[in-house]
């Protein structure tokens, strides 16, 4: 997974709208970033470096998508491609693990003392360039209102599961995300898919005593399956 290059920080006007005159200064932010993943953090860092007041809001935990990856996942890429903010990412082996990535991004957030509001759902964004209004709700039901000159949407795509749109897909025994094999020991599991995620999940399940059937629509696994995974799955 290669972290996208942060968005360029646009020029932000030095003066605030007149409607802000009677409000507390700390209720305003130059930049509000929606999403506390690697890209969102990188955007906040670049805004902060440019001298702007940035805040990050996320409905989940820090780098929530990485947290939800399979527990024992190892990235396909090397650590330097995951670095942000000029903070070195050192790992025990050639490729970082999920746990190493979580620790790294926590360290980055602490180093830059980023203003991050976790477990806050963005409910509405209104207004216009230079004067946006953002309403959020936290996990306790409290409502918060923010105003910002610029908005960066860095929500990613991990929440958008690949749907088959077939009968039975909404049953309780059907899952679109995989965490670990242990709960499925000595059971029958069908994995649907022909790319890396499906291949790695099927192999992990099989290696932990699960009876696995891998279903994919092609005559063979997709060409995108990594070369070091393919021999074991085929």
Residue ranges and their predicted role:
Residues 51, 231-234:
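Short, intrinsically disordered, charge-balanced linker/junction segments flanking boundaries
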Residues 82-98, 124, 131-135, 212-219:
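Helix-loop-beta segment of a Rossmann-like dinucleotide-binding subdomain
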Residues 88-107, 116-118, 219-230:
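Short beta-strand to alpha-helix junction loop
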